[in-house]
Amino acid sequence: MLRWLTAGESHGPELIAVLEGLPAGVPVSLDGIRADLARRKLGYGRGARMAFEQDELSLSTGVVHGRTLGSPIAVRIGNTEWPKWVDIMSPEPVDPEKLQGARAAALTRPRPGHADLVGMQKYDFDEARPVLERASARETAARVALGAVARAFLAELGITLVSHTLSIGPVRVPEGAPLPTPADVDALDADPLRCFHPETSARMVAEVDDTKSSGDTVGGVVEVLAYDLPPGLGSHVHWDRRLDSKLAAALMGIQAIKGVEVGDGFLTTTRRGSEAHDELFSTDAGIGRSTDRAGGTEGGMSTGTVLRVRAGMKPIATVPRALRTIDTATGGAAPANHQRSDVCAVPAAGVVAEAMVALTLADAVLEKFGGDSVGETLRNLRGYLDAIPEGRRTGADLVDEADAAPPAAPEA
């Protein structure tokens, strides 16, 4: 199984992440991780911090000459802005004279929608700085770095991930629009909002512009697709072993995510049973499904079709036209603290969601197929697939009902 942990504050010296349980032999490069960290900064509507904040990446342990060793992997992401925060975020006591000025002022006006107030209550802080530093989405850089390593492992098994933006505010990709494939990743990353539907992307840009001009923020929905998963990841046996349960928890753990769907999700609740499920048909290639409404999972297990999971991101809570709050130092009404923020970070949320799905799937693969090396894991996977009896093997991802063999007539 995989175990992983991140540490670090938004304006601290560095973020640290440790990943344990990955087999030996996974090809890992700093350039590959840097590429995903750069993708995390993409998207129309991002704030100024993305322009000047650089990720100083290093691998401390677990990788030698571009291959994992099977031992814990430690990633460090240095903060180029640290010199500005040395005194304010120092782990050692600092002369109060050095803590003068606006940057060091106590943050006593908690922001609605953030962890500020509840964190102050829970941890007995008299200001929000100790809370917001860790609650910040800056922490997701560490998760994206680990996700890049997990993606490299999955790629060795032929599994690839793609994310794209489905909606920004009320602007949404039309139902039934083509899904992006791994071949479309470069085109997606070149789009200002990582949307695969050009006409919708242009309307999304206009929505972000309108939101910015009104001093507001906007959210949206992203979708992650996983191609070429084997059937049988996860289990129906216990709630906490269900693959969709693990994916939902992983995605809900991303800052500002307020909802998750698997497959057609809540749309399925509007249909009758005869139109809500994926019928099975026999083909020359094996068993196929007429649709993928379930989104690649049934009974808590992967089906072998394309996995589809969606995450809904709320509008960023740090609103330029500051929301109303209470100054906890005086008890009086006040505008909320406002720091640099994005108008829209939905495209970046897609990249973070990719990382979380990659880590979750890598863990599920290792739970099912084990292996102390990539080669052993791959042999176990192939052996499992070869052992599935011919009459139970799945073939093409989707089958056109008109081309499928009719179901056998029941015996008299």
Curated annotation (Swiss-Prot):
GO terms for molecular function: chorismate synthase activity; FMN binding. Its EC number is 4.2.3.5. The keyword Lyase applies. Pathway: Metabolic intermediate biosynthesis; chorismate biosynthesis; chorismate from D-erythrose 4-phosphate and phosphoenolpyruvate: step 7/7. Pfam families: Chorismate_synt. One of its GO terms (biological process) is chorismate biosynthetic process. HAMAP family: Chorismate_synth. This is Chorismate synthase. The gene is aroC.
